[in-house]
A protein has these predicted regions:
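Histidine-dependent nucleotide/RNA phosphoesterase domain, centered on the 2H-phosphoesterase fold
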Residues: 1-178
């Protein structure tokens, strides 16, 4: 048995982080929905996933960061309108979604997917759907809201996060504007 089988792993993903004021506003809006199903995602965990990597060997992280640093970025801050509430029944989640993803965001996701191919992370088999998860284990219809969602997620960098026991920790970040 090789030492490789004992290599520690981290659960990683690339995402756009939410600013504290965005988190507060979204959490307040979610609270007004008075939801009676599911588990709320803690506001400090709000983000928009770009590319989920899953379990990654610790020894690969530096190379992944080097590859991410070479990703061609939009050159402008990203603005993603989160203007739709949706229930993804298969996953049991309530999400804030974007009616239309900005082309710059789609190009960034594609560039990240291409940069991760040499590490064995394949292109996502599904179409990228920008979203922010509000609730997990959600089993009801889309809730009615007195105020429609109109949140603009603004990002000037993208981040590599580690997920550990429900807590997300930023490991590295790269600017979108050079």
């Amino acid at each position: 048995m090789s030492d490789e089988s004992h290599e520690p792993f981290k659960r990683l993903f690339f995402a756009l982080n939410c600013a504290p004021e965005q988190r507060r506003a979204i959490a307040q809006w979610r609270g007004a929905l008075q939801l009676r199903s599911g588990r709320p995602v803690p506001a400090e965990n709000f983000h928009l996933t770009l590319k989920f990597l899953g379990a990654v060997g610790v020894a690969q992280i530096a190379d992944i960061c080097t590859a991410a640093a070479k990703v061609r970025v939009p050159g402008v801050a990203l603005r993603v309108m989160l203007d739709r509430v949706d229930v993804w029944r298969r996953h049991g989640v309530l999400v804030l979604a974007s009616e239309q993803a900005p082309p710059e965001l789609l190009r960034l996701v594609y560039a990240l997917e291409q940069a991760m191919l040499p590490f064995g992370f394949e292109d996502s088999p599904k179409e990228f759907r920008p979203h922010l998860t509000l609730m997990r284990d959600y089993r009801l219809p889309v809730p009615e809201s007195a105020t429609p969602p109109e949140f603009i997620l603004r990002a000037e960098h993208f981040t590599l996060f580690e997920s550990h026991k429900g807590c997300y920790r930023a490991l590295a970040e790269w600017p979108l504007i050079l």
